[in-house]
């Protein structure tokens, strides 16, 4: 498409989504669930066809020199397809938040005032190489009564198109608007630029991708976003920590998986327990191939315990989300220093304290300014499924609207509703 064509095309998509959003807001729970279950059945029915189409995307990606990790994210295996279908069924089983009325209060004037949960309207979702996001995102938007515009990575264009056809089939079967879910049918990057500025049609943008994508959108978007830029997550081992518990949690927080945004990137250890906590952890990390970047105090403790192969941490390390087997470690004087470090260098994503002291733990919860703050638990729990949300569209470390894992309720808003019996204001 030419530049003008892309702008016109995206404006058409936006108008169609806005119209569809009104129909979605009226849709009942049974109708939305019927669409989700039909899509799940269609995904399973067409599994072989989906893999065949996806193989063409994978072949092109290999020819373009994409690495093994990228190919893994792009590939639709039998397991990935079954997971997509199961996810649709799980979302269908979740309670429908739309139309709930809460916080009802009787006012002295005789009126009743409450809040009703309603859809946001039109949600633009921008993501990269994972075709499963097409289905996951569409499902959450359908269940929450929103229309959505999905712009996936160009590498998955055929896979996304095939999944879009199945979603359209499910919408039709349930009698929902055909344009409630639209997958952008061009790989032209200008489509993203248009999508993130269409304030007249799009209510919110949810980006799912790497740091460079998010940084670009922060600079260029006019539509509000639900997003996080970095996941610089910390665990602090307090002076009153159970060391065995600390070792177990910190091992999991770093080494269960290296790439997720809720993986620990910096370990903070109270000077009072450094000699007991650091050696067993360093042994685990080095056995698993984790590079340790340490402050002078941590180096002294570990070298005294016979450890080598340590790198000196520099200022940039405290700001870095590695997404790799690399860990920064700092020995601190206590809780005040730990909180100060986290609030200075963290990304307001997820941070945890290991302590047996109730007052210390509660102070950490109050004073650490992050979307998820934990006591005696791995940062890897910062996830919509683990929080009981059923599914998530992403994680936000912003403070407005949604914060932390964003599930169905994060894709809704509250409006005030008033019940009266003819009351007038005097």
From Swiss-Prot:
Catalyzed reaction equations: L-glutamate 5-semialdehyde + phosphate + NADP(+) = L-glutamyl 5-phosphate + NADPH + H(+)
GO molecular function, one term: glutamate-5-semialdehyde dehydrogenase activity
Stored SUPFAM superfamilies: ALDH-like
Localization per record: Cytoplasm
Main localization (coarse): cytoplasm
EC number(s) given by UniProt: 1.2.1.41
Annotated pathway: Amino-acid biosynthesis; L-proline biosynthesis; L-glutamate 5-semialdehyde from L-glutamate: step 2/2
Keyword annotations: Amino-acid biosynthesis, Cytoplasm, NADP, Oxidoreductase, Proline biosynthesis
Pfam family, one: Aldedh
Gene Ontology BP annotations: L-proline biosynthetic process
GO cellular component: cytoplasm
Cited function: Catalyzes the NADPH-dependent reduction of L-glutamate 5-phosphate into L-glutamate 5-semialdehyde and phosphate. The product spontaneously undergoes cyclization to form 1-pyrroline-5-carboxylate.
Family stated for the protein in its record: Belongs to the gamma-glutamyl phosphate reductase family.
PANTHER family noted in UniProt: DELTA-1-PYRROLINE-5-CARBOXYLATE SYNTHASE, GLUTAMATE SEMIALDEHYDE DEHYDROGENASE
Protein name according to UniProt: Gamma-glutamyl phosphate reductase
Gene from which the chain derives: proA
């Amino acid at each position: 498409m030419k530049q003008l064509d892309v702008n016109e095309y995206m404006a058409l998509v936006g108008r169609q989504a806005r119209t569809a959003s009104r129909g979605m807001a009226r849709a009942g729970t049974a109708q939305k669930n019927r669409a989700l279950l039909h899509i799940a059945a269609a995904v399973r029915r067409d599994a072989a066809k989906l893999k065949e189409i996806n193989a063409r995307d994978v072949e092109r990606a290999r020819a373009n020199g994409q690495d093994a990790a990228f190919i893994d994210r792009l590939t639709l295996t039998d397991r990935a397809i079954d997971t997509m279908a199961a996810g649709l069924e799980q979302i269908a089983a979740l309670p429908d938040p739309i139309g709930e009325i809460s916080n009802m209060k009787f006012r002295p004037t005789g009126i009743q005032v409450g809040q009703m949960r309603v859809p946001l309207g039109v949600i633009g979702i921008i993501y990269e190489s994972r075709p499963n996001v097409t289905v996951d995102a569409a499902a959450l938007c359908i269940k929450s009564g929103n229309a959505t515009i999905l712009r996936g990575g160009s590498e998955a264009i055929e896979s996304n198109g095939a999944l879009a056809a199945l979603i359209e089939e499910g919408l039709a079967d349930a009698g929902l608007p055909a344009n409630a879910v639209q997958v952008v049918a061009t790989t032209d990057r200008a489509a993203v630029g248009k999508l993130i500025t269409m304030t007249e049609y799009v209510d919110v943008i949810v980006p799912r991708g790497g740091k460079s994508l998010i940084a670009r959108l922060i600079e260029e978007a006019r539509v509000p976003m639900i997003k996080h830029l970095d996941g610089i997550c910390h665990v602090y081992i307090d002076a009153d920590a159970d060391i065995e518990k600390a070792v177990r949690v910190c091992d999991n927080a770093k080494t269960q998986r290296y790439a997720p945004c809720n993986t620990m990137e910096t370990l903070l250890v109270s000077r009072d327990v450094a000699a007991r906590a650091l050696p067993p952890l360093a042994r685990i990390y080095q056995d698993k191939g984790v590079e340790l970047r340490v402050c002078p105090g941590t180096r002294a403790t570990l070298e005294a315990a016979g450890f080598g192969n340590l790198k000196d941490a520099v200022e940039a390390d405290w700001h870095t989300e590695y997404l790799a087997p690399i860990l920064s470690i700092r020995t601190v004087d206590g809780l005040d220093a730990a909180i100060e470090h986290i609030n200075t260098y963290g990304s307001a994503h997820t941070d945890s304290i290991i302590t047996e002291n109730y007052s210390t733990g509660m102070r950490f919860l109050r004073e650490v300014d992050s979307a998820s703050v934990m006591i005696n638990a791995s940062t890897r729990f910062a996830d919509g499924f683990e929080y009981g949300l059923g599914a998530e569209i992403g994680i936000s470390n912003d403070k407005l609207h949604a914060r932390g894992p964003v599930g169905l309720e994060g894709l809704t808003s509250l409006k005030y509703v008033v019940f009266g019996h003819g009351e007038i204001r005097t």
